[in-house]
Regions:
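Short, P/G- and charge-enriched loop/turn segments at secondary-structure junctions
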Residues: 95-99, 328-335
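Extracytoplasmic/secreted proteins, especially bacterial periplasmic and envelope-associated proteins
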Residues: 10-21, 63-71, 75, 175-182, ...
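N-terminal "domain-start" segment that seeds a small globular fold
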Residues: 178-181, 185-225
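Long compositionally biased, domain-poor regions of proteins
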Residues: 318-331, 338
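Thiol-based oxidoreductase modules, predominantly thioredoxin-like and allied folds used
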Residues: 28-90, 263-314, 318-319, 325
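Non-catalytic, surface beta->alpha helical segment in thiol-disulfide oxidoreductase systems
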Residues: 100-194, 335-385
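Short catalytic/ligand-binding loop motif for oxyanion handling, primarily in non-cytosolic enzymes
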Residues: 11, 41-42, 118-122, 246-247, ...
Length: 385
């Protein structure tokens, strides 16, 4: 089971308790989630489910949404409110420069997926060879202390309010839960069995050097998880890189071995918002690297401003070409920061200071395999302090 949703979204927060309840009642302990909002920010600026012509930063990556729908969710039109034939469908430009149109999936949506399913379980007539989306539940509601509800809107899309100026609410808890329960009844009636995949499975498959490792202490994290971890107390070790990068592939076994030996997890963050799949597999020219993309490099500089305040690299110190990024902060000041070259491994403690008492959260870093020991030593020193 997969849910397209985000913790920033009030509709997601409304759905989650009900979805979790029915999943537990039916013995489903894992629901895989994905968010089309690149930085999970509530302002929606990096939301990629946008049609060409939109003004937010995410529209530059709307092909990521389009390709996922076109290549994998091929029958999603049968299950959503705004399929590709409606005015609210999503248009994007493919790798060949052609305009494509796909259905507009609302967040949140929960669905049962099997890429090899050949049975059409929807009530729509279709002659496809496969129907990977076996069942989907897409209903937009909100939640308060009294339950689930929808708001009332006028013909122009404005909220209808009562005499006190509060939005008019129509509570629908029982109806909503009954509709969601149908998905779980479908699971039981059709004896659907779920296959579980873990982050470790992903790491082993995408990093061949770790395929047969006795233990894997490399834990992949999303952008939001990375930003959150950097704000937590205590010591940690992080690695920046991705499976597309040969240098990361060459070093990751050594990093994992040292992590296992030191009984510590290393959190691996990929600076590509698409894992470089758009370039390597789909033929797009636009880069998904947040350090190189003008439209979303603020995601990278935000990490530096908020957490990685003493970040530096050898190439940055030597003034090498391409080793820095210049931008203007919220105050309009021009800043220049280092660009990380994968793989980059560092030990971190948000409260660490240097010998002069100045904040220095990155306590050690490594850009080469032969300097990894310094990172693990700094981590160990931080633990014993």
């Amino acid at each position: 089971m997969i849910a397209l949703c985000g913790s920033w979204c009030h509709n997601t927060r409304a759905m989650t308790p009900s979805l979790t309840k029915y999943a537990k009642e039916n013995g489903i302990d894992t629901i895989y989630t994905y968010d089309f909002n690149l930085d999970d920010n509530e302002n929606g600026n990096t939301f990629i489910r946008m049609s060409d012509g939109s003004e937010n930063a995410g529209v530059n990556y709307n092909y990521m949404y389009g390709e996922v729908v076109k290549q994998y969710l091929t029958n999603i039109d049968d299950w959503i409110e705004f399929p590709s034939t409606t005015e609210r469908a999503i248009s994007y430009t493919n790798a060949k420069g052609e305009t494509e149109t796909v259905g507009r999936i609302q967040q949140p949506i929960a669905f049962i997926y099997n890429k090899d399913n050949t049975t059409n379980y929807s009530d729509k007539e279709d002659n496809a060879d496969k129907y990977p989306v076996m069942y989907a539940f897409e209903q937009m509601v909100e939640r308060d202390k009294d339950g689930l509800y929808t708001k009332e809107y006028d013909e122009e899309g404005n909220e209808v309010t009562d005499k006190n100026g509060d939005p008019v609410k129509h509570y629908c808890t029982k109806k909503y839960n009954a509709q969601m329960k149908k998905m779980f009844d479908f699971i039981n009636d059709n004896n659907i069995e779920f296959t579980e995949y873990s982050k470790e499975d992903f790491v082993r498959e995408n990093y061949p050097a770790l395929k047969d490792a006795e233990k894997v202490n490399i834990k992949t994290v999303t952008y939001r998880q990375f930003a959150w971890l950097l704000q937590q107390d205590g010591n940690a070790i992080y690695m920046v890189g991705g499976p597309y990068d040969e240098a990361t592939q060459n070093e990751i076994a050594d990093v994992n071995a040292k992590a296992v030996k030191n009984d510590v997890n290393v959190y691996l963050w990929d600076p590509y918002v698409d894992g470089k799949i758009s370039e390597d597999d789909w033929g797009y020219k636009n880069t998904g690297d947040i350090m190189k993309s003008d439209s979303i490099n603020f995601m990278y500089t935000t990490l530096i401003e908020n957490s990685l305040t003493n970040l530096t690299t050898e190439e940055f110190e030597n003034g090498a070409d391409g080793a820095s990024l210049t931008y203007k902060n919220d105050a309009g000041e021009e800043k220049t920061v280092p660009v990380i070259k994968s793989p980059f491994v560092f030990s971190f403690n948000k409260d660490a200071t240097d010998e002069d008492g100045i904040s220095a959260p990155i306590t050690a870093y490594s850009e080469k395999a032969d300097t990894l020991d310094a990172v693990f030593s700094a981590y160990a020193d931080g633990i014993t302090k």
